[in-house]
Amino acid sequence: MTKVIKSKYKVSRRLGTSVWGHEKDAINNKNYKPGQQGNSSSVSKPSDYSKHLVAKQRLKSHYGRIPEKQFRNTFKIARKKSGNTAENLVGLLERRLDAVVYRLNIAPTIFAARQLVSHKHIKVNGKKINIASYRVKAGDSIELSEQAKQIPIVIGAISKKARRIPEYLAFDDEKFIGNFIRMPSSISEVPYPFDPQINLVVEFYSA
């Protein structure tokens, strides 16, 4: 197991859930924090602050460990928009280009999706975009570069039989082109592998 994978598994154990939904995630076998000797019943109950903090950290980690400043700014934009702040926040996060590539199952992980973007393997409406935080909009097309179509992890991700693509996205396996059809209609439509507790995240930044 590589150091990077070990690091990711430690994140899941520290946050008490499989942040990225990996079947082999260490949290599935060791449901206690790194450094803790076994599942001790003497561990104190988390405070309200720690619950809110963990919810925020889980969400940040799920989207590839977004830097705090960038994540906070995203929340500020969500709060200024009309409507429900929690749904606005999720909508903004789901519009990130790296998140869209990940949701389309073009890449096996959010980190691999981000690399595809940063290495200029992704086109939006025919234009190469190498900014992971770039926000796509309804109707945008997401296309792989010719070189990316030959990358083993991309081929492997697309050829998986158990691929699940959210209804607000679409992907043409033959043309290697995806579409951001619309915004998620609700938080429950987003395929989080854990309870995202978005309201706790909103409360954390609103305190």
Curated annotation (Swiss-Prot):
Region annotated Disordered, chain positions: 26-49
SUPFAM superfamilies hit by this protein: Alpha-L RNA-binding motif (SSF55174)
Keyword Coiled coil tagged: no
Segments forming domain S4 RNA-binding: 95-158
Any GO molecular function: structural constituent of ribosome
Classification via InterPro entries: Ribosomal_uS4 (IPR022801), Ribosomal_uS4_bac-type (IPR005709), Ribosomal_uS4_CS (IPR018079), Ribosomal_uS4_N (IPR001912), S4_RNA-bd (IPR002942), S4_RNA-bd_sf (IPR036986)
Keywords associated with the record: Ribonucleoprotein, Ribosomal protein, RNA-binding, rRNA-binding
GO cellular component entries: small ribosomal subunit
Source domain of life: Bacteria
Polar residues bias spans: 28-39
BP-aspect Gene Ontology terms: ribosomal small subunit biogenesis; translation
Summary of subunit composition and partner proteins: Part of the 30S ribosomal subunit. Contacts protein S5. The interaction surface between S4 and S5 is involved in control of translational fidelity.
Family per similarity comment: Belongs to the universal ribosomal protein uS4 family.
Chain's role: One of the primary rRNA binding proteins, it binds directly to 16S rRNA where it nucleates assembly of the body of the 30S subunit. With S5 and S12 plays an important role in translational accuracy.
Protein name: Small ribosomal subunit protein uS4
Species for this entry: Orientia tsutsugamushi (strain Ikeda) (Rickettsia tsutsugamushi)
Gene name for this UniProt entry: rpsD
